Amino acid sequence: MRNFAMQGKPIIDISLKGEHGPHGSYISSFSTMDTLEGEVAITAPHDTRFDDIEICFVGTSETFVDKFSTAPTTMSSRSDASHVFLKLHQPIDESALPMPRIAEAGRTYRFPFTFVIPTQLLPKACQRYSNDQIRAAHLQLPPSMGDTSISGHGGKLLDDLTPEMARISYAIKVLITRERDTDGKIVTLVDKSKKVRVKPAVDEQPPLVVGSNDADYRLRQEKTIRKGVFKGKLGKLVMETQQPRSLRIPGARSADNCPITTSAKVVLRFDPADENCQPPRLGGLSSKLKVMTYYATTPRREFPRREQTLLDISQGYYAETLSLSSRCMSAAQWTKHTPTAAEVAATSNPAITRRDSGISDCSDSSNGKNNIPEPSESYAGRTYYTANLLIPIELPTNKTFVPTFHSCLISRVYRLDLSLSISTTTSLSLKVPLQVTADSSEEGASERAERDASQALQREAEAAMHEVFAPRSVAPPTVDFPSTGAAPPGYEDSALASTRGTGLETRIRVMG
């Protein structure tokens, strides 16, 4: 037993201040600008020689993609990737380490640590990008995801809808190393990690620009509505929306369990086939949230798209769809509009005034201040009808959600799918980009405000110093003599002559 104990490795214990937060034993979350404070205690069961102790805060992305072969004789393979995008080191005072470097048996050595979670990564974390927008997105701190032992909300462990092929983790790591006598190689005597859940503050970004040929999103659709299966046309129905405000989740360590909500506004336009046709009776409108996770084993230079994953074997895609609500819209009120002279004139030259029906930028497709969609392709300048539908959106409480983000290997994006039924055979659908953002923690918000104020004062001081030490001209002022003008009495003839050619000629008459 003594010989077995002598072979024991040093015991490392990592304690983190406030690690359980307001939810008891449930692991707490930390946000950007939050401070991680704690202590590392190391106890050796016997005298142990070492050379270095490393305490660091590490962020890592891990992915894998299975490669399936269609050939029966070829086995499928798997490619994987790991990216350490963040590593902060805690300096250790030399006086806290024993000299010589031998941990005495039974003695406990304590090392405090302090880390501040940064708002963004260092530039070296992303070396491959196609433009500054991609780089800026990749340098944002990604959230913890893919670990069911720490994901949750409101004190409950919940599914964060991440596939096993992608994981982002943070941890405080401690390594005790020694240089091997035989070859000088650094070997690890013992190491230990403590998981930390990071939920960074994420601000809302500008709405996504959706083109007419976008396969992932659609903000406008129009369809022909018929009177019956074998009957004539009733008219054209246009369904249009724009990207709603983001769903904003509470900050880290928040006790707020209020519903996370936003709303989407859908605008309908009906262009009747003739003046006698009335708007169709609306059916139900269902809303679903599509949660999409993109992952890759090679760094990406662009924002991911669904079609890319079908062509590039190093990329993968995983999606889950959550039902949000289903509402009857039969009571929607239609508003009748008489076309203006400009709208009637536009029908005579649609090539100039009407854009492709697939274009989804509502700032261009809306008609004036009334937010009326542009006419359908078959609009002939007749009376038309519009209706507005307000769709409330609320995140389910049986899942947990991470903010929208893009990193070199992993991305998480969300989409709102809206489907409006008109009859048993006709429906219109929209695929709307939707952002999920996150508030700062109270500590992080306070730290950010102090930092912004300090930076503002520093900029003012630098501007004042620049003004003080700015170079000044010591040359005499330039005097411009007029080429013409009245001279004092008696000096008319001795006035300075005007310039001639490129030189200045002066005539002086001596008065006697």
Question: Residue spans of the language-model regions?
Answer:
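A surface-exposed loop-and-adjacent beta-strand signature within N-terminal beta-sandwich domains
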Residues: 1-160, 165, 173-224, 303, ...
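Low-complexity, intrinsically disordered activation/interaction regions
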Residues: 170, 174, 192, 283, ...
